[in-house]
Amino acid sequence: MMTTRTSLENKLALQLEAAIGNVTPGVVLRAHAGGTVVCDVQVGDTRRYYDFASLTKIVFTQQALMQAYDRGAWTLQSTVGDFLPDFSRPNIRLTELLTHTSGLEWWMPFYESIDQTLPWRARRQWLYRQLQAAPCQPTGKAVYTDLGFMLLGFVLEALHGKDLLAVWQDLRDSTYPGSSLAMHVDNQPVHPVEAYAPTELCPWRKKRLQGEVHDDNTWSFGGISTHAGLFGSIDDLAGYGLALRAQMRGLPGARVQASTAELFTRRAIPREAGDWALGFMLPALQGASCGNHFSARSVGHTGFTGTSLWYDPQRDLLVSILSNRVHGGRENKAFLSLRPQIHNWIVEGL
């Protein structure tokens, strides 16, 4: 059924059509003001499902830890050693992992040495040993690290007494019922590959990735991780955003108390150390990915594949964006300039 675009949608579609060029094959976006859809636009070559990349960190990992905190399973003083007593650096606080201030190495090419013939659960045991030995040099400043969120996955397993896939499935069923959010176990897509936005021509997998997670380490782990791995639609991403909005505004059905959501979404480290709440990005003074108009109370996150979600509680404005900007190669950074402009266009058009 054809739907009529609003004037905002018409204008935004024209702006995007003129802008995407060699930036990305397509963009899917949805904006909510006051919890109501005010903009729903698809431009270019778009598909139903997208690789969420690091949005996994908020849709899964941060949300699971926030809910665990809400039920009293850990405190702001809790350390890795409280849950993983054999870990080599037991005094790292969970809050340091959430704010990327632990000092753990930002990234390591685990995919180059992991035995991919092992079942994914055995690969996780191997990964734990690698994290034990990973470099860790705290500086007092935030250094974005995938390894910190990988470690949080083992904390979640200990908190729940279940493997990571079961932890994810429980969260999905309780917090996102009816969603199509999925991790691709053993890197097997749950839908026909044509339904997925293709990402990069991978030099070592020697094929165009479609329905396979773009992140090399997550792929080598069997598609299951806490730093990347989720696939979903714009309905799924916006659904998460509305769930977060309900938590922050204390609305009926929210999965955590408003006081917990307020704690996790406020600035957690000094500005000179970085722009982080507990698991969420905050708008930077210069070059914020949410553009120039979102308030300092806004929270969000981005994904390497060209995804993002930002919510401004002062404007009560939620913007969800999916793209496959890595299709032409990960070195194409043009989307990093387009994304804040999209947020500016939306705010200026309302």
Indicate residue ranges for each PLM-predicted region.
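Short, surface-exposed loop or secondary-structure junction motifs
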Residues: 90-296
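Hydrophobic (often cysteine-bearing) scaffold residues that line and stabilize catalytic clefts
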Residues: 8, 12, 52, 56-57, ...
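Short, P/G- and charge-enriched loop/turn segments at secondary-structure junctions
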Residues: 15-19, 266, 294-299, 306
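Short, gly/Ser/Thr-rich active-site loops of penicillin-recognizing serine hydrolases
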Residues: 246, 260, 265-268, 285, ...
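A short, well-structured edge-of-sheet supersecondary motif
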Residues: 15-52, 73-76, 108, 113-116, ...
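Glycine-rich phosphate/pyrophosphate-binding beta-alpha loops
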Residues: 223-229, 296-310, 324-329
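Short active-site loop at a secondary-structure junction
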Residues: 21-28, 43-97, 135-147, 225-228
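Active-site SXXK
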Residues: 13-16, 51-76, 152-157, 237-240, ...
